[in-house]
Design a protein with these regions (language model features):
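Acidic/aromatic-lined carbohydrate-recognition and catalytic surfaces
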Residues: 1-175
């Protein structure tokens, strides 16, 4: 585990553990989460680790008066992620500092609760592009000083999601 992650984790460990145990009362699950967090940090690229470090040094970065965001439906604004990337000059002209894209993740079609019935939290909806398209867009936004925001709302899980299917099938772990 990198020294920077270890130091940051140590600052927040007590709060994380308290919240997790209040919600789940599952010490083993907490240990799994902590290992997964360390593994995820190790897997982050150098560019994101540098951004983490800069933001940790300036914890109020997101409270500045120059923060200006835009929320949009990707499909309605640009059709897909590749077309959205072509709007970068417009975003820069607007002095955008963060962009919140809704909904973006794989969903069942046509019954998807306006895009909020998520079928796969790890995959961009094919109608909007690919995970690689999202990575490319994110990198270009970051170069322009724009942070990407996405929603991960677990109660927006589609009935066709593997978790829901396992629950319906009677899997006790998912129930």
């Amino acid at each position: 585990m990198a020294q920077e992650f270890s130091a940051r984790f140590a600052r927040h460990k007590d709060e994380l553990e308290w919240l997790f145990m209040e919600l789940y009362n599952n010490r083993e699950g907490l240990e799994v989460l902590e290992r997964e967090m360390a593994d995820a940090y190790d897997a982050r690229n150098a560019e994101l680790k540098a951004l983490d470090k800069a933001r940790a040094a300036d914890p109020n970065w997101y409270k500045r008066g120059n923060m200006f965001g835009m929320t949009m439906y990707t499909d309605l604004f640009a059709g897909n992620l590749k077309e959205l990337a072509k709007k970068l000059p417009y975003f820069k002209e607007q002095k955008l500092t963060y962009l919140h894209l809704m909904p973006l993740l794989q969903m069942p079609h046509p019954h998807n609760d306006g895009g909020y019935a998520v079928e796969d939290f790890d995959t961009v909806d094919p109608a909007l592009g690919t995970n690689k398209d999202l990575e490319n867009l994110t990198r270009e936004l970051r170069k322009a000083g724009i942070s990407l925001c996405l929603d991960f709302v677990m109660n927006h899980t589609a009935s066709t999601h593997r978790w829901a299917m396992a629950t319906k099938a009677g899997d006790p772990w998912f129930q």
